[in-house]
Amino acid sequence: MNLKQQLNKKPNLQKHLFERGYLITDDDYSGALHDYPFYGNWKEYVFGDYRFYVYQTVSAFFQQIGNRTFFLIGHAYDPYNMEPDENKLLQYIGKAYGTDEYFDRLDELTGLFIFGSVCGNSIDFTVDASGMQYGCYGTVQGKQYISSHMRLIGDLCLLETDDYVKRLVNYKWYHYMMGNYMPGDITCFRELKRIGCNTYVSFDGSGYSVERFYPKKAIKMCQTDAEYNEVIKEAARIMMNNMKLIPMKWQRPAISLTGGIDSNTTFAAANGVYDKYTTFSYISMYRESVDAEKAKQISDKFKVKHVVYQIPEKNEDIADYEIYKAIIEHNDGDIGTYSDSDLRKKITLIKEDVCEVEVKSWISETIRAYAYKYFGRTKFKPDLKPRDYSSLYKIFLGNRKLLKETDKYFAEYIQNTKLKEHLFNYDESDFFVWEMMHGGKCGLDIGVMKGCFDITIPYNNRKLLDLLLRVPLDKRISDRHHLDMKKLMNQELYDMNIRVVNLNETDRRKKVINMYYIINTHLPF
């Protein structure tokens, strides 16, 4: 499908292309803002040598401090200082520029954003704690590009999809194990790299450099019950502060609620401000009906309005299904297809007036030792090799050439971001979940979902995540820490004992995928 031709025929759908995106460049597109791919939906700001093109519904904040302009595109709030105002946060962080406090203050932010500063032709930038605001960057024909969407840069610069990426996304096992995303920090174009969460990218006029600023030091694990209880108490306080701050920023926040532990804990954190929230669920397949039923039961108990969205069962029941599909997959980078049921869900929520912002419970998996859960393991070796990363990433038993190429991209990522030098005593498998599964995949997913509504994630705070990584591994695997947080924040909800387990996480599936991991990491080729 020629997307440009189709959108010319459907001007009412043009607004969904690269929706809620941004582009930072030293090239000038001011005369093209009414053409493809902008279609008159973007605004422009100019600071230093750079032009900031931002989708019309996205907030952009700029603060001048000395000779530097600090910027934040998206949203942020600080649960440690109870500050919801991005301009004040820019001042707070920017004044610490060049000191050790700079990144410490940045670590306190919850939100989805790209943050950085500009001075003349130099620019530096990073993304939120888990990269839920996706970002990629690179030099094309002597011009600098930083964007929320790799295909936006590709469309503007007529870039060609990398040959490795073409072969990867057409590989028969590519869609398994967490869906569509790229290894390491690559994108679909050789010219562009993904902005890795926990790293800071700088351009000095001649080239890019990447600095890892987290972790900074060894983590202090909980050794006693008293230390564990203090961690739970502090984590609960920060989560509840986040849930108090969200209604200060949006008029109609809604928690996407299921019977699972992640959103249950989020809902518990809203205790005391339930009158500020609604909840919603959707049913696109049978197993989701169980989640929706439990979500309604929880909401009714605490007198919170709950809405269930029934997703059509057939593609034909959704007008313009094929063009929506093309837009969504292009926004995602054209790095794989979505299932029909997932597309029907997204399109339905795009068309519904669900909320102003969804309070989403992603990123919780980082602190729930998700690699251990997914593979049914109780132990990973402390020093993972590129082959371990590839084996955690995709199933490659049938294509060793593709596997070796993938190994190479993970090796480059580990080296370029200096991950090994900063691991200290952290569990490396947590960083695969944090920086690959979340930063690499979920950031792209969020970029697509923001076509439905804005999204915020109360777990997405580096200081909070680091705090909960102090919890002993057995408690993280069993979700004891989440249950204890929920009990502390809302005893009544805890006493309801509602827990719907992901039906995909069967013991048989875990055994099979773990056997693959063992075999693939031991084969010498």
Regions found by a protein language model. Give the residues of each.
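Cysteine-centered catalytic environments shared across enzyme families
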Residues: 1-255, 265-309
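ATP-dependent adenylate-handling active sites, centered on carboxylate activation for C-N bond formation
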Residues: 1-17, 23, 121-124, 132, ...
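Structural motif
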Residues: 104, 163-169, 420-431, 477
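Radical SAM enzyme core and accessory elements
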Residues: 521-525
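Core structural elements
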Residues: 431-444
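Short amphipathic alpha-helical segments embedded in low-complexity Lys/Glu-rich regions
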Residues: 502-504
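Short, surface-exposed acidic
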Residues: 98, 165-166, 491-500
